């Protein structure tokens, strides 16, 4: 495990925490549940937040902390601007030496078990505390956090309305340390049905299923861009729609593919960030569509993934 954890510090790298005024308003929440995964919960609740607002869960990658990712990716400022509750799970070194979420361990990815259950308990606590809307709960994350996002959407599809995976891998790709490296690069090529069966087998849920937005850099050598396509195949199969885009356009000049149902509702989408390596797309600034703070694996590519995710979710 130590070998994997040390390697993961590079392979599923994290954002360096940077203190800001917004991050200082984050607070740790204890006693949110039985916490079988022994995670820490941090939360940002805007002052005067009315009841009935959404909840977003944002998950970091290896070696980073909740505040660093929440601030760097832009989620803290968006929570304030759009008025939603932000939940930031944080891994502990006792679980993983480099604080990677254990997205490749069966005991931490099965419904009702380990880290996945801890995150689900955080959601329920946040909903109860703020009077949030249980129909508008979303999950997102970078790299290892993106892989854990796939876990949460698959294991708790009744909890999450949608998700955003940045530089992640499909659910069920790995069940061991060795598998984890293969999943990241070069990735695993399975049929859409095989990928879909992994999700359908993760719970007794029969639908509706969470929507999914997948962001990935085209020159990512840490988590192969092929994983973006495999995620599309997995979730279009789950939704019962073809893995062929119904429309294509661009977002901030980057290729954007939409996979919609017969009514035109977007169920799966991808954004391929041309020329970007491994990291979270951000666009620092004060403009309406801008957010984030540049740093390690927080890449200023003139588009903020967090803002576009929040817009697609109607936050």
Residue spans for each PLM region:
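A domain-start/cap signature at the N-terminus of enzymes
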Residues: 3-6, 19-55, 67-74, 81-85, ...
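Active-site glycine-rich loops that stabilize anionic/oxyanionic intermediates
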Residues: 53, 60-65, 276
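Structural cue for short, hydrophobic secondary-structure segments
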Residues: 58-61, 88, 214, 272
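Conserved alpha/beta-hydrolase "nucleophile elbow" surrounding the catalytic nucleophile
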Residues: 60, 140-146, 217
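Cap/lid segment of the alpha/beta-hydrolase catalytic domain
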Residues: 90-114, 176-177
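Alpha/beta-hydrolase active-site loop
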Residues: 107-130, 151
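Short glycine-enriched nucleophile-adjacent loop
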Residues: 146-158, 164-167
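Short beta-strand/loop motif that positions the catalytic acidic residue
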Residues: 214-216, 220
């Amino acid at each position: 495990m130590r070998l994997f954890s040390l390697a993961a510090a590079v392979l599923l790298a994290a954002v360096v925490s940077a203190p800001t005024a917004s991050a200082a308003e984050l607070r740790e929440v204890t006693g949110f549940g039985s916490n079988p995964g022994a995670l820490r919960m941090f939360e940002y609740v805007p002052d005067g937040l009315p009841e009935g607002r959404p909840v977003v869960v944002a998950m970091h990658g290896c070696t980073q902390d909740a505040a660093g990712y929440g601030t760097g990716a832009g989620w803290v400022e968006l929570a304030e601007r759009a008025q939603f509750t932000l939940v930031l799970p944080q891994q502990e070194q006792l679980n993983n030496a480099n604080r990677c979420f254990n997205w490749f361990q069966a005991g931490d990815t099965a419904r009702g078990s380990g880290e996945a259950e801890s995150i689900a308990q955080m959601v329920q606590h946040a909903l109860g505390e703020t009077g949030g809307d249980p129909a508008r709960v979303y999950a997102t994350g970078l790299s290892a956090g993106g892989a854990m996002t796939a876990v949460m959407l698959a294991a708790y599809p009744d909890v999450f309305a949608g998700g955003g995976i940045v530089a992640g891998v499909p659910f069920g790709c790995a069940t061991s340390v060795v598998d984890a490296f293969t999943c990241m690069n070069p990735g695993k090529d399975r049929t859409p049905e095989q990928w879909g069966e992994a999700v359908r087998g993760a719970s007794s849920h029969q639908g509706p299923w969470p929507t999914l937005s997948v962001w990935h850099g085209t020159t990512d050598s840490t988590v192969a861009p092929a994983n973006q396509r495999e995620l599309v195949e997995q979730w279009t199969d789950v939704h019962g729609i073809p893995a062929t885009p119904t429309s294509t356009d661009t977002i901030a000049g980057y290729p954007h593919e939409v996979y919609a149902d017969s009514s035109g509702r977007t169920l799966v989408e991808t954004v391929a960030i041309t020329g970007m390596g491994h990291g979270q797309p951000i666009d620092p600034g004060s403009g309406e569509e801008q957010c984030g703070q540049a740093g390690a694996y927080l890449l200023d590519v003139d588009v903020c993934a967090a803002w576009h995710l929040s817009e697609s979710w109607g936050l």
